[in-house]
Amino acid sequence: MPTPTKGPRLGGGPAHERLMLANLAAALFEHKRITTTVTKAKRLKPYAERLVTFAKRGDLASRRRVLGLISNKGVVHELFTDIAQAVENRDGGYTRITKIGNRKGDNAPMAVIELVLEPVSAKQAVVAEATSAAKRDADKKEAAAAPAAETEVAETEAAPEAEAAEAPKAEAAETEEAPAAEEAAEKPAAEEKDAK
């Protein structure tokens, strides 16, 4: 037995339900906001967001999948060009449902469902700008470091010879300092034992 779709039934059969959702999605993408019942808006939200996700991918296979659901080529073109670019930096949450009260004739609860096309948030825009600036600075530093690295290589080739001459002198100085440091460490320890 086929499993029924999640969410409330929209009346009619499953084919009528699919066509109704496709038409609501096409109207939403064409007009950017539509007024409908709360139940239809709640069923439309995941459907429309899934289509926007396909549009963000932007490849031919995704376009053909959306064209299989929405037959209006003009709406699909607008979805893949305008809407996908507007929500490029947004990870989900492409639609917003706002309840507007009940309908006058049959007292059905109504809602406005609209596309969220404004930028994600000012803070995230600033963070994105800062990260891009940091990348540019890092690239500049790498470019400046490349000539400096060549001169460092020449200096490091000469440095081992100088270090080899300095090494015996440093070892002799360390051996002289080591016993003096041990004696200095033993004196405070002995004083602490006497104080107890």
Swiss-Prot record:
InterPro entries, alphabetized: Ribosomal_bL17, Ribosomal_bL17_CS, Ribosomal_bL17_sf
Pfam families: Ribosomal_L17
PROSITE patterns: RIBOSOMAL_L17 (PS01167)
Alphabetical list of SUPFAM superfamilies matching this protein: Prokaryotic ribosomal protein L17 (SSF64263)
Annotated GO biological process: translation
Key words, A-Z: Ribonucleoprotein, Ribosomal protein
Region (Disordered): 133-196
Ranges of biased composition (kind: Basic and acidic residues): 134-143, 184-196
Any one Gene Ontology cellular component term annotated for this protein: cytosolic large ribosomal subunit
Source taxon at top rank: Bacteria
Biased composition (Acidic residues): 152-164
Molecular function in Gene Ontology: structural constituent of ribosome
Subunit structure: Part of the 50S ribosomal subunit. Contacts protein L32.
Family named by the database record: Belongs to the bacterial ribosomal protein bL17 family.
NCBIfam families registered for this protein in UniProt: L17 (TIGR00059)
Name by which UniProt lists this protein: Large ribosomal subunit protein bL17
